[in-house]
């Protein structure tokens, strides 16, 4: 199973209980900046290593992730802040999953796009 896990934008208290459960149950964690993710893991008191997944190793790591999924491992890709695959490498992994008929899910949470829209005062109806 592949999870794309949204993470807090600035305030670590904004992490969802569902996100914590998914992170805790994951066999492997991947993130663009493992230093940011390690701060979050420390905050939620989960002792797991996080592997780097960024534009420079995206092809190699995507193959690893797909192999882990085929081996029935639970994988979570975490954003540095907000929703994965928005301004980070996750979208290419999603394309590969679609191509290989691999199921994936999003653990929703903070989104800078929605926050920006709300703070702009523009009509949303």
Task: State where each predicted segment sits.
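Glycine-rich, flexible N-terminal cofactor/catalytic loop recognition
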Residues: 1-56
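Short, glycine/charged-enriched secondary-structure capping and boundary segments
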Residues: 18-21, 43-46, 66-67, 89-94, ...
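Structural motif
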Residues: 32, 53, 78-80, 105-107
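Short gly/pro/ser/thr-enriched loop/turn and capping motifs at secondary-structure boundaries
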Residues: 37, 84, 111-114
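Glycine-rich, highly charged phosphate/nucleotide-binding loops
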Residues: 57-66
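Ordered, amphipathic secondary-structure segments that act as subunit-interaction surfaces
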Residues: 71-89
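Class I SAM-dependent methyltransferase SAM-binding "motif I" and its flanking Rossmann-like core
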Residues: 92-125
């Amino acid at each position: 199973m592949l999870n794309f896990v949204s993470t807090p934008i600035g305030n670590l208290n904004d992490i969802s209980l569902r996100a914590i459960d998914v992170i805790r149950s994951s066999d492997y964690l991947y993130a663009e900046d493992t230093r940011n993710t390690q701060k979050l893991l420390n905050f939620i008191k989960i002792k797991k290593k996080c592997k780097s997944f960024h534009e420079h190793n995206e092809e190699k790591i995507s193959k690893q992730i797909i192999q882990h999924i085929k081996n029935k491992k639970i994988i979570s890709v975490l954003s540095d802040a907000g929703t994965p695959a928005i301004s980070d490498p996750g979208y290419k992994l999603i394309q590969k999953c679609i191509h290989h008929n691999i199921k994936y899910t999003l653990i929703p949470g903070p989104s800078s796009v929605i926050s920006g829209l709300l703070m702009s005062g523009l009509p949303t109806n």
